[in-house]
């Protein structure tokens, strides 16, 4: 048995010693850093640009601004490459700009709040958040400028976010509708600040011009108590009352 162990170790060491010619890095994007004067901090973002085949004329592309970029960059790039090349898909190729987080609660929430999902505030809970307006300025005034200077863009802008970032996406649509052309909100945190966004929708939705805008909303169905009691009712209200009024 000892001789077998020695043989196994020798094989592994020998294998590790060989140059593996097939081990070349596969790159799907580039890393960038931009200092934001709006946020007063450096922000990292990753960029994917569709490849141009040899002999093809370089094209210009829509830009998808992906929030929580460090979590979703690889999967979203994979989806865009798959569906933009599929014969049954009408999704055009697009540039993906994945924005990495430094403080997602601060950046993605429209108000400062200590309320939990169920609306309660317990002793010791501290208010946080409320920086969505500033973060929107960073995206549209600073990051977009850097992207458009360096990349082959066609002037179409998409914004996609999940959870807190989904709430941010809806917040931008309601308050700054001209900022983007297409909004994709995945399972947005409508419970934030005791359902603040839904109340804001009721006050503002009829005063906002959504013409030419596209909104895609998806909600998870994970069986969790707070989803049944809090998340789903807010979702039903949003889809039932707000979305039809946005379509007018």
State each model region's role.
Residues 1-6:
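Positively charged n-region of N-terminal signal peptides that target proteins for export
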Residues 7-17:
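Bacterial N-terminal signal peptides
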Residues 18-22:
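Sec/Tat signal peptide C-region and signal peptidase I cleavage site
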Residues 23-248:
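Non-catalytic cap/lid and distal C-terminal segments of serine-dependent acyl enzymes
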